[in-house]
Structure formats: C-alpha cells, structure tokens
C-alpha cells in the first residue's frame, strides 16, 4: 500500500493592519499592543483566568485592575 504525503498548510502571515493603528489626521502609525518594559518585546493580552499582559520572552506580567 502506498502512503500519502501529509497535506501542506499555507502559512498565514499576520497583517500589519492588525498590529498598528493609523491616525489619518496626524499621519501617524501607533502600535496597538504594549511593549515590555524589561526587554522591549511585544506583550500579549490574556483574558483567562485573570486579565493580564504577559511577555513571552522574559516572563514579565502586568495584571489588570
């Protein structure tokens, strides 16, 4: 019996429009997410179990009030 090769998935790259906000009046791009104060990487927002911002690179966490 012949084995089938696994189907290759297309990689979907994130669009820059999802990362930035554009202010047309001022002509300025602004980053939507927070940057880590320790290492400068982009922080991710998590809703469960407690709302918080977390840096995956250095482990820094800011809890929401």
UniProtKB/Swiss-Prot annotation:
SMART domains, per the entry: Ribosomal_S27
Gene3D superfamilies in the cross-refs: 6.20.50.180
Binding site for Zn(2+): 36, 39, 55, 58
Free-text comment on the cofactor: Binds 1 zinc ion per subunit.
Cofactor or coenzyme needed: Zn(2+)
Chain ranges passing through the membrane: none
Superkingdom of the organism of origin: Archaea
GO BP terms in the entry: translation
Zinc finger (C4-type): 36-58
Signal peptide: none
Any single Gene Ontology cellular-component annotation: ribonucleoprotein complex
InterPro entries, alphabetized: Ribosomal_eS31, Ribosomal_eS31_arc, Ribosomal_zn-bd
Keywords carried by this UniProt record: Metal-binding, Ribonucleoprotein, Ribosomal protein, Zinc, Zinc-finger
Keyword ATP-binding: no
MF term (GO), any: zinc ion binding
Family: Belongs to the eukaryotic ribosomal protein eS31 family.
Quaternary organization: Part of the 30S ribosomal subunit.
Protein name in UniProt: Small ribosomal subunit protein eS31
Organism per entry: Pyrobaculum aerophilum (strain ATCC 51768 / DSM 7523 / JCM 9630 / CIP 104966 / NBRC 100827 / IM2)
Gene encoding the protein: rps27ae
């Amino acid at each position: 019996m012949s084995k089938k090769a696994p189907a290759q998935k297309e990689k979907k790259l994130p669009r820059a429009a999802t990362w930035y906000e554009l202010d047309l009046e001022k002509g300025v791009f602004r980053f939507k997410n927070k940057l880590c104060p320790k290492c400068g990487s982009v922080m991710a927002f998590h809703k469960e179990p407690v709302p918080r911002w977390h840096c995956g690179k250095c482990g820094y966490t800011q809890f929401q009030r």
